[in-house]
Swiss-Prot record:
One of its GO terms (biological process) is ribose phosphate metabolic process. This is RNA pyrophosphohydrolase. Accelerates the degradation of transcripts by removing pyrophosphate from the 5'-end of triphosphorylated RNA, leading to a more labile monophosphorylated state that can stimulate subsequent ribonuclease cleavage. Belongs to the Nudix hydrolase family. RppH subfamily. The keyword rRNA-binding does not apply. Its EC number is 3.6.1.-. Keywords: Hydrolase. A motif (Nudix box) lies at residues 47-68. The gene is rppH. InterPro entries: NUDIX_hydrolase-like_dom_sf, NUDIX_hydrolase_dom, RppH. Residues 8-160 form the Nudix hydrolase domain. It comes from Bradyrhizobium sp. (strain ORS 278). Signal peptide: none annotated. Its cofactor is a divalent metal cation.
């Protein structure tokens, strides 16, 4: 059995979707093993990069698969890949125990559509499993307090990097 410390990170993207008022999309997670309590169930869209896919293409795909949103403009990306470890207590169940956490490339995107474009109940034209049960717009600086604690350092970095883009 592979030791936790020797497991690789899953390569992913994260998206800060910013509306015209400078607020950021967050979704309430539909459930899963990452949950630690009912307070920290909100997050921005994120997901894995497929083999041969570049991070920007993955970001657009994941955003559509989780929110149905296609009306976006790229504002910025964080140069570094940000990582977090999942707690050992869930590492054996998350991603079938193959990863110790995630390595993420983060993008800031301007949402250019109308709120009616967002569909978290039947995302991606109804062809994808719902990741969120509801959503809202939130000031970016509030997000680190709404995320599961083990992702908080990543969200703090994202909030710092994208603060001027999101009205902060």
């Amino acid at each position: 059995m592979t030791r936790y410390e020797d497991l690789p990170y899953r390569t992913c993207v994260g998206i800060a979707l910013i509306n015209s008022e400078g607020l950021v999309f967050i979704g309430r997670r539909a459930g899963g093993i990452e949950h630690v309590d009912d307070t920290h169930v909100w997050q921005m869209p994120q997901g894995g990069v497929d083999p041969g896919e570049d991070a920007w293409e993955a970001a657009k795909r994941e955003l559509y698969e989780e929110t149905s949103v296609r009306s976006v403009e790229k504002l910025a990306e964080i140069d570094d890949w940000l990582t977090y470890d999942i707690p050992r207590t869930v590492a054996g169940r998350a991603w079938k125990g193959r990863y110790r956490g995630q390595r993420q490339k983060w993008f800031a995107l301007r949402f250019t559509g109308k709120d009616s474009e967002i569909d978290v109940e039947h995302p991606g034209g109804g062809h994808h499993k719902a990741e969120f049960i509801t959503w809202r717009w939130e000031p970016l600086q509030n997000l680190p307090t709404l995320i599961v604690p083990f992702k908080r350092p990543v969200y703090e970095r994202v909030a710092k990097e994208f603060a001027t883009l999101a009205g902060g």
